[in-house]
């Protein structure tokens, strides 16, 4: 995905060298982190590795996406029907338990109400049940501990002002 982002940046007119995507092994990454020629570090991955890299960055700007909180950004010019369908299946398929499940949706304020309506319609259409049954999209959580964790997240969100919509 990161390599594709680099290709898209070039196609969009970012000059060569303006954005560098450097997938590499740990030893090389750590040398790049301390190299003063690089002004920004962007890292997606585990919290343990991200915080270790941040400690080594010194005064560089750092953007960390840690712990698997896969985010989706919905802009006003997006195909909202397509985005709502993909966010619904991406967030609820396999009960949201894969490392690439949609866990956050960032929506431009000008389309937030419309997108929310479309997303709720898509989520309501998802079939829940036994994962071995054909057509089931939303199966059970893996164990009681996982269910308790989800209930805790919901309670925390509500305590901070969120509303349960479905």
Residues of each region from the PLM?
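Short, surface-exposed connector motifs at secondary-structure boundaries
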Residues: 12-13, 33-40
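Alpha-helical segments flanking ligand/cofactor-binding loops in enzyme cores
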Residues: 3, 30-31, 51, 155
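PLP-dependent aminotransferase-like
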Residues: 1-29
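Short, solvent-exposed polar/charged micro-motifs at secondary-structure junctions
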Residues: 29-32, 148
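Conserved strand-to-helix beginnings and helix N-cap segments that scaffold or border functional pockets
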Residues: 2-3, 35, 151
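ALDH superfamily catalytic-core signature
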Residues: 18, 40, 46-166
């Amino acid at each position: 995905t990161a390599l594709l982002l680099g290709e898209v940046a070039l196609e969009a007119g970012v000059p060569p060298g303006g954005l560098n995507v450097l997938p590499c092994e740990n030893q090389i990454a750590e040398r790049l982190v301390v190299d003063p020629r690089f002004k920004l570090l962007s890292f997606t991955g585990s919290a343990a590795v991200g915080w270790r890299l941040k400690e080594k960055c010194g005064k560089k700007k750092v953007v960390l996406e840690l712990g698997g909180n896969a985010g989706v950004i919905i802009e006003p010019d997006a195909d909202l029907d397509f985005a709502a369908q993909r966010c619904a299946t991406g967030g609820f398929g396999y009960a949201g338990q894969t490392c690439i499940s949609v866990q956050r949706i960032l929506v431009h304020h000008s389309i937030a109400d419309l997108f929310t309506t479309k997303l709720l319609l898509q989520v309501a259409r998802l079939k829940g049940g036994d994962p071995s049954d054909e057509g089931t999209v939303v199966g059970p959580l893996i164990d009681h501990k996982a269910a308790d964790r989800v209930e805790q997240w919901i309670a925390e969100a509500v305590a901070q002002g969120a509303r349960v919509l479905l």
